[in-house]
Amino acid sequence: VTVVEMLDRILPVEDEEISAGLEKLYKKSGMDIRTSTTTTNVEKTKKGVKVTLAPFKDGKADESKAETIEADKILLAIGVKGRFDEAFDESLGLQVVKDHIKTDYDPAHPEPQELTYKTSVPGVYAVGDVIGPPWLAHVASEEAIVCVERIAGHDPIPIDYSVIPGCTYCHPQVASVGFTEKMLTDRGLKKDEDYQIGSYNLQAHGKAIAAGHNQGIVKIIRGLPRGEILGAHILADQATELIAELTLARRLEATSEEINVTVHAHPTMHEAVHEASLASEGRLIPG
């Protein structure tokens, strides 16, 4: 298997440590990972496909260093955008901005707001992928509920778009919520002054060993001085299940201390969350 990624790392929206960890595991399993690489040509052959690859830098492909590989099949997976062609009569006059239907939702402002999801046409509402990122099924579902409840005259609790879990169903899985370390440093925050990080490797985790999947890491970023959960990033066999606890913690503005004093059942994968939280305070007990 050859994975071709135009950017400089796989899963570029995830925490860099998680991306690097997944790439290391994939290479160890025999996968060929090509980052900073693009596809310049694809030809169908009798046996499958012939693909031309070239280094990609500064928005350009370096054709002088192109190479060709052959494969049985090719899978194109370069992102998601809302598709609404033929979904409505164009004569309605719905306002479309940057490939999405315009509503009172603005991806640039993820904080909780009393949104209606009204479009530019009275009586017409839009939710989900067609109104912009994040393009996630669980977000679309929640938007639909909030939208309909507001139409019905209720006063639903607004969605906090800064607390949306992201899940990648690879193996091992990847899941995250909140800020990555780079996002914090880009905002001028400094490690050990404004935030601390706790990481817990699953290599010695009892339940992970018993299940035969002890490769991965749980990483928690907590703010200073209060200890609130700023971000959480997981590479693990059950990462998409584990992220729920940390999503709830961030939504309720819980602190690492509150996670630490919560007894986690043993043996469970959720103990890894507890261990990472302890590590963020420098209290991890060596196992």
Locations of regions flagged by a protein language model:
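Rossmann-like dinucleotide-binding cores of NAD(P)H-dependent redox enzymes
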Residues: 1-55, 59-67, 134-141, 149-183
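Glycine/Thr-rich phosphate-binding loops of Rossmann-like dinucleotide-binding domains
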Residues: 11, 83-86, 134, 206-208, ...
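Conserved beta-strand segments of alpha/beta enzyme cores
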Residues: 32, 95, 193-196
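A short, glycine/Asx- and small/polar-enriched loop/turn
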Residues: 44-49, 121, 212-215
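Short acidic-glycine loop/turn motifs at beta-strand connectors
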Residues: 46, 97-98, 224-226
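FAD-site-proximal beta/loop scaffold in flavoenzymes
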Residues: 61, 68-151
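Flexible, glycine-rich terminal cap/loop adjacent to redox cofactors
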Residues: 152-153, 164, 169-287
